Each structure stands twice: as structure tokens, then as C-alpha cells.
Design a protein with these regions (language model features):
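Long, charged N-terminal interaction/targeting segments
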Residues: 1-81
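Cys/His-clustered metal-coordination modules, chiefly Zn-binding fingers
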Residues: 69-99
Length: 99
């Protein structure tokens, strides 16, 4: 699935003015697709954007949770996993460049 396909699939959860997933790394898209199945069950869940900044992911979302520390923990966990996948993808790219 591409980022565009992902964004179309989850369009009901991406508010106007936001763009959702902003890059194409297949492993990241597959991971997010699985995670989104749970996230969309959270009351008030909105996906704002997922972007790379200095080769580190930023995962922006919002929920109706009163305890925003829960959002911060969830964000930390998701960003950590995506960063791992991004790093693996960039290492594969380097290997292909030198072989």
C-alpha cells in the first residue's frame, strides 16, 4: 500500500487541513495500517500527519482522552517502531548502493 492509498483508506480520520502519511516506505505503511485498526477504536481519534524530519518520524494525532500523558506514551511507542523501520529501510538502501 502506498501513502496515498493509506490516506484514502483512513480519510474519515484525517481532518481537513492535515495530510496523514507523508512518505512511502512499505514496511512503515504496513505497520501503520495494522496500528490504525486499533487507533480508530479510540474515541475522538484523528490522524493529523506522519512525516519524516531529519530522518526521524513525527506522528501527530489527537484523541478525546483527558489524560494527555497517555497520548504521549502512545506517540512515543509508535514513533519508536516507525523509526526502527525507517532506519532498517535506509540501511537496505545503503547496502544496495554499494553492491
Amino acid at each position: 500500500m502506498t501513502a496515498n492509498e493509506f490516506n484514502e483508506k483512513y480519510k474519515p480520520y484525517i481532518p481537513e487541513g492535515w495530510y496523514g502519511l507523508g512518505f512511502d516506505i512499505l514496511e512503515v505503511t504496513n505497520y501503520l495500517d495494522k496500528v490504525m485498526e486499533d487507533l480508530i477504536m479510540i474515541p475522538g481519534f484523528e490522524l493529523h500527519q506522519v512525516k519524516l524530519k531529519f530522518n526521524m518520524v513525527r506522528f501527530y494525532f489527537e484523541t478525546n482522552w483527558k489524560d494527555k500523558s497517555l497520548e504521549a506514551e502512545l506517540q512515543y511507542k509508535i514513533e519508536g517502531q516507525i523509526n526502527k523501520l525507517v532506519k532498517e529501510d535506509s540501511e537496505v538502501g545503503k547496502d544496495e548502493m554499494f553492491n
